[in-house]
């Protein structure tokens, strides 16, 4: 999860987030090299008064600075497209959970079970227990099995929302009248926090998301107790 004064990304918990982190590092290195080259050229131009006459009109140079940026863009685009297709692909999910956004709470329905649905509201600050996080804790957590592909169906009952859990690499818009889907897969157990990431009204900041990823046997026990 996030911590105060954090500069980097949250620790990756899903294969998709691991790919996104690697892509971020890959792109950042390219940007760093380009910035270093530009600063070097600018410093040379500022510190020398000599002019190379052949560079005033050089077809070779113009060809290079046309082809080189195109090649760099390809190096950025190819891994980006790969991850984009990975995020959109859902293979044989073991569980489907329908998520509906409301002003200002989330409701969840486990479509593979009868009558397993609940609303999830933020816990007010004055009701927090020791160890719980302010503005991030909810009264009903979303319990899911770890290391298994889970399909999330996401929509909204009123205005635009966005269901986002950074450590899982998830951010999917909740649009009224439209059903979007995303894949949830966690490599380890734990609590993972997110929030609504689309400004949706005065209480937009008070729509937290808490996923509790547990081993399959614990999930089966929890689901049996909820039905």
Swiss-Prot record:
It is found in: Mitochondrion inner membrane. Cu cation A1 binds at residues 161, 196, 200, 207. The modification Phosphotyrosine is found at residue 218. Its cofactor is Cu cation. The chain crosses the membrane at residues 15-45, 60-87. InterPro entries: CcO_II (IPR045187), CcO_II-like_C (IPR002429), CcO_II_C (IPR034210), Copper_CuA (IPR001505), Cupredoxin (IPR008972), Cyt_c_oxidase_su2 (IPR014222), Cyt_c_oxidase_su2_TM_dom (IPR011759), Cyt_c_oxidase_su2_TM_sf (IPR036257). One of its GO terms (molecular function) is copper ion binding. It comes from the Eukaryota. Its EC number is 7.1.1.9. The keyword Oxidoreductase does not apply. Residues 46-59 are mitochondrial matrix. GO terms for biological process: ATP synthesis coupled electron transport. The keyword Magnesium applies. Keywords: Copper, Electron transport, Magnesium, Membrane, Metal-binding, Mitochondrion, Mitochondrion inner membrane, Phosphoprotein, Respiratory chain, Translocase, Transmembrane, Transmembrane helix, Transport. It is a multi-pass membrane protein. Binds a dinuclear copper A center per subunit. Residues 1-14, 88-227 are mitochondrial intermembrane. It catalyses: 4 Fe(II)-[cytochrome c] + O2 + 8 H(+)(in) = 4 Fe(III)-[cytochrome c] + 2 H2O + 4 H(+)(out). Mg(2+) binds at residue 198. GO terms for cellular component: mitochondrial inner membrane; respiratory chain complex IV. Belongs to the cytochrome c oxidase subunit 2 family. PANTHER family: CYTOCHROME C OXIDASE SUBUNIT 2, CYTOCHROME C OXIDASE, SUBUNIT II. Component of the cytochrome c oxidase, the last enzyme in the mitochondrial electron transport chain which drives oxidative phosphorylation. The respiratory chain contains 3 multisubunit complexes succinate dehydrogenase (complex II, CII), ubiquinol-cytochrome c oxidoreductase (cytochrome b-c1 complex, complex III, CIII) and cytochrome c oxidase (complex IV, CIV), that cooperate to transfer electrons derived from NADH and succinate to molecular oxygen, creating an electrochemical gradient over the inner membrane that drives transmembrane transport and the ATP synthase. This is Cytochrome c oxidase subunit 2. The lineage of its organism: Eukaryota, Metazoa, Chordata, Craniata, Vertebrata. The gene is MT-CO2.
